[in-house]
């Protein structure tokens, strides 16, 4: 499972429980288009490691 964290200027949003890395990556790319979104991070829940990052 993967969790996506979307960082805005003054707060963060989370999208937990994404089943596959491919789905998480696609969702992260969509979230990166949100107005005001800064960094979007995909984290592997099992290992705790960051698997994918988009910084703007």
Regions found by a protein language model. Give the residues of each.
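Short aromatic-glycine-(Arg/Gly/Cys) micro-motifs in beta-strand/loop hairpins
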Residues: 1-14, 41-44
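A short, charged, amphipathic alpha-helix used as a generic interaction element across diverse proteins
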Residues: 18-40
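Surface-exposed loop/edge segments in extracytoplasmic proteins
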Residues: 11-17, 48-53
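Aromatic-residue detector
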Residues: 3, 11, 27, 53-54
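Short, mixed-charge low-complexity intrinsically disordered segments
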Residues: 33-56
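Intrinsic disorder/low-complexity segments, especially N-terminal tails and targeting/processing regions
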Residues: 6-8, 20, 52, 56
